[in-house]
Regions:
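Generic structural "secondary-structure junction" signal
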Residues: 9, 94, 133-134, 203-206
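Short capping/connector residues at structural and topological boundaries
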Residues: 12, 33, 206-209
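Glycine-centered structural positions embedded in regular secondary structure
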Residues: 5, 87-91, 184
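Flexible, active-site-adjacent loop/turn segments at secondary-structure boundaries
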Residues: 5, 26, 199-202
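Short, basic, glycine/proline-bearing loop/turn elements
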Residues: 1, 150-162
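Amphipathic alpha-helical
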Residues: 160-211
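Covalent nucleotidyltransferase
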Residues: 14-153
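Phosphate/adenylate-binding "loop-and-lid" substructures adjacent to NTP/NAD/dNTP-binding pockets
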Residues: 1-14
């Protein structure tokens, strides 16, 4: 079953309680991507073959991404050992942050050519920032990513800053994210994952968003 990812509200929608555990990540200007293991779903394999499972990637609306085979290939052995984990992140490349359309055009191809696949392999990365698990707090989910999800040239862990104690501290980190070329910042509370738009996840792109 394909899960819907958690979506963010603007920071201005509801005040943040900095007495709780608060986390900040850079906001990526990428393509939302959920990756999970699906058992017995590959009709292209010989029925006598033992392994009819596959790793599948899809958008926030459930549309399958067809042109990231290089990422799915690297993740399949890991998913075979972790079949119930669902990764949440974005297809992104920080070196292409000023050419967002390039990533979009590559990942949206439903019938990619050999050249399209080569371009995607060179340019498209999966940046993982959460796992879809409605039983764990964000701190637990973040720790799982750091300790278990593989990292390489095309699978990246999104950095997480924890222990945010005040709005001034949050703004300072947000300013640093902007200076590093990110679209903005994502603020997370230490709550369980919600497969809907949730105040557990807030976004702001500039200081006006935070102060509105």
């Amino acid at each position: 079953m394909r899960k819907k990812p958690m979506l963010a509200y603007p920071v201005s929608d509801k005040p943040i309680n900095y007495e709780d555990k608060i986390f900040i990540q850079p906001k990526l200007d990428g393509v939302r991507c959920v990756i999970q293991y699906e058992k017995g779903f590959n009709p292209n394999l010989d029925p006598s073959h033992d392994d009819r499972s596959r790793v599948v990637a899809y958008s926030r609306t459930g549309k399958e991404w067809k042109n990231i085979e290089h990422i799915l290939f690297l993740l399949k052995p890991w998913f075979a050992l972790n079949p119930n984990v669902i990764l949440d992140g974005e297809l992104y490349n920080h070196d292409l942050r000023d050419d967002f359309e390039k990533i979009i055009s590559l990942v949206r191809k439903q019938k990619p050519t050999a050249e399209d696949r080569l371009d995607a392999e060179k340019l498209t990365q999966f940046h993982c920032y959460d796992i879809i698990d409605e039983t764990k707090t964000f701190e637990e989910r973040s720790r799982f990513i750091q300790q278990n999800v593989p990292r390489n040239h095309c699978i990246i862990h999104v950095p997480t800053t924890q222990g945010i104690c005040s709005e001034d501290q949050a703004k300072a980190i947000h300013k640093m994210n902007l200076r590093l070329g990110y679209e903005g910042s994502i603020v997370r509370t230490n709550d369980k994952y919600a497969c809907k738009r949730s105040h557990n996840l807030r976004k702001f792109k500039d200081f006006h968003d935070a102060e509105a």
